C-alpha cells in the first residue's frame, strides 16, 4: 500500500484506522527510530517554520523531546526500518521476508520538501521491491495507491498497479 504521508497524521491514521492494519508493516524512517539520530532528523525535516522567532528555542528543545518519545512508540508498531545509506539492503531484505510470510507493506513514497510540505515528485528507490520480489518469489507485486484525506477522515484505496517484470522501471 502506497499512501500519501499527510504529515504526521497519515502514518497514524494508517496504523490506527486502516482495516488491514493487522497484516501490515510500515516502512519507517530509521532516523526517527533511533534516539541518537532523531535530533538531526527533526532539524532537517523542519518541524517548525524556518527563521521563526522561536527557532533557537525549538532547536534546543523539540529535537530532544522527540528523541525521548518517538523511537519507543515507533519500535512498538510493526515496521521495517528504512535506511538512507548502504544499509538500505536491510530494508529490502526484511520487506521480502515479510512478503514471504503473507504480510503487506505500507510505503510512504512522498519526498519531503520542507516545513509541512511534500514535493510533487515521489521517491523512486522503493520501487526496487518489485524486481526483488519477482526475482526471489516469482510474484508480481501489486502496489495500491492510497489517499488519506484528513479533512474527511477517509482512507481510499485505488485499484492496484501490478509490477511487470518485462517493463523497465
Give the positions of each predicted feature.
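Soluble catalytic domains of membrane acyltransferases
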Residues: 1-168
Amino acid at each position: 500500500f502506497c499512501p500519501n504521508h499527510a504529515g504526521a497524521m497519515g502514518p497514524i491514521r494508517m496504523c490506527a484506522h486502516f482495516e488491514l492494519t493487522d497484516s501490515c508493516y510500515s516502512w519507517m524512517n530509521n532516523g526517527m527510530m533511533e534516539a541518537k539520530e532523531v535530533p538531526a532528523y527533526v532539524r532537517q525535516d523542519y518541524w517548525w517554520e524556518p527563521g521563526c522567532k522561536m527557532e533557537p528555542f525549538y532547536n534546543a528543545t523539540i529535537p530532544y523531546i522527540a528523541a525521548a518519545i518517538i523511537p519507543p512508540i515507533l519500535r512498538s508498531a510493526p515496521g521495517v526500518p528504512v535506511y538512507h545509506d548502504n544499509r538500505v539492503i536491510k530494508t529490502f531484505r526484511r520487506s521480502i521476508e515479510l512478503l514471504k510470510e503473507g504480510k503487506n507493506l505500507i510505503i510512504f513514497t512522498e519526498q519531503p520538501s520542507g516545513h509541512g510540505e511534500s514535493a510533487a515528485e515521489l521517491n523512486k528507490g522503493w520501487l526496487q521491491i518489485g524486481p526483488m520480489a519477482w526475482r526471489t518469489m516469482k510474484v508480481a507485486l501489486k502496489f495500491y495507491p492510497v489517499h488519506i484525506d484528513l479533512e474527511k477522515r477517509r482512507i481510499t484505496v485505488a485499484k492496484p498497479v501490478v509490477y511487470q517484470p518485462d517493463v523497465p522501471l
